[in-house]
Amino acid sequence: MSKIQTTFQRLQAQGRKALIPFITAGDPDPTLTVPLMHALVAGGADIIELGVPFSDPMADGPTIQRASERALAQGMTLRKVLQAVREFRSGDADTPVVLMGYANPIEAMGQQAFVAAAREAGVDGALVVDYPPEECVEFAAASKAAGLDPIFLLAPTSSEQRFADVARAGSGYIYYVSLKGVTGAGTLDLDEVARRIPQIRAAVGMPVGVGFGIRDAESARRIGAVADAVVIGSRIIEEIERSPREQACSNVTHFVKGIREALDTLPGVKQ
């Protein structure tokens, strides 16, 4: 059983929901990436999604695009992201880390080389936005063989066939995109999310995390009432953007802690 699967199993036994915050590696500068990862854990993160900056992040809204631009301007690369995970692991052997990004940097490194390097660094999962499950069978198989969970996106428009493809190729959890469009945009339709989550869970047999459109403790709590995990990214990037550098980590911890506390007031949590 993978570290991600073990985390969800533990949380389920506690009646708790997973909190999965996202930051972009290298933003606001590479020296803050590892401290910010520890700050997320201090705030109550169960799993960290670490963004690999890319020059054309098609699924990301302006906030995460800006984070990618800042990181790339500082010289952040996939290999440097892996080095950051390695450094994080020297102080935290337990918190699962999922790399989230795009195919181009992985293809440049080579899929097999990426899988090996990611596992060696201490990465637990990879969510590659433009790797549809039906087209990356070899990557998914190689990832699973190495103990790396391949994680896939589902959306309100996803078909039953896509559910089946994701169930076959994926492991760890599903990232359900709760809005049509890009990250950080729009408003949540909670009724639609609540209707879709049981369908997805039954079809894929994995925990379902919901992201896109979650901006505060209240929206996180509302999503946590129906999902297995809450994914929050753009709002954390905004917190980093508006913070003086020396206060970024403490401000991020404070913000994440508020989300964690809201999730832990949901019915069913075993105190």
Swiss-Prot record:
<dbReference type="InterPro" id="IPR002028">
    <property type="entry name" value="Trp_synthase_suA"/>
</dbReference>
<dbReference type="Pfam" id="PF00290">
    <property type="entry name" value="Trp_syntA"/>
</dbReference>
<feature type="active site" description="Proton acceptor">
    <location>
        <position position="49"/>
    </location>
</feature>
<comment type="function">
    <text>The alpha subunit is responsible for the aldol cleavage of indoleglycerol phosphate to indole and glyceraldehyde 3-phosphate.</text>
</comment>
<comment type="pathway">
    <text>Amino-acid biosynthesis; L-tryptophan biosynthesis; L-tryptophan from chorismate: step 5/5.</text>
</comment>
<dbReference type="InterPro" id="IPR013785">
    <property type="entry name" value="Aldolase_TIM"/>
</dbReference>
<dbReference type="GO" id="GO:0005829">
    <property type="term" value="C:cytosol"/>
</dbReference>
<protein>
    <recommendedName>
        <fullName>Tryptophan synthase alpha chain</fullName>
        <ecNumber>4.2.1.20</ecNumber>
    </recommendedName>
</protein>
<dbReference type="InterPro" id="IPR011060">
    <property type="entry name" value="RibuloseP-bd_barrel"/>
</dbReference>
<keyword id="KW-0028">Amino-acid biosynthesis</keyword>
<dbReference type="InterPro" id="IPR018204">
    <property type="entry name" value="Trp_synthase_alpha_AS"/>
</dbReference>
<feature type="active site" description="Proton acceptor">
    <location>
        <position position="60"/>
    </location>
</feature>
<dbReference type="GO" id="GO:0004834">
    <property type="term" value="F:tryptophan synthase activity"/>
</dbReference>
<keyword id="KW-0456">Lyase</keyword>
<keyword id="KW-0822">Tryptophan biosynthesis</keyword>
<comment type="subunit">
    <text>Tetramer of two alpha and two beta chains.</text>
</comment>
<keyword id="KW-0057">Aromatic amino acid biosynthesis</keyword>
<comment type="similarity">
    <text>Belongs to the TrpA family.</text>
</comment>
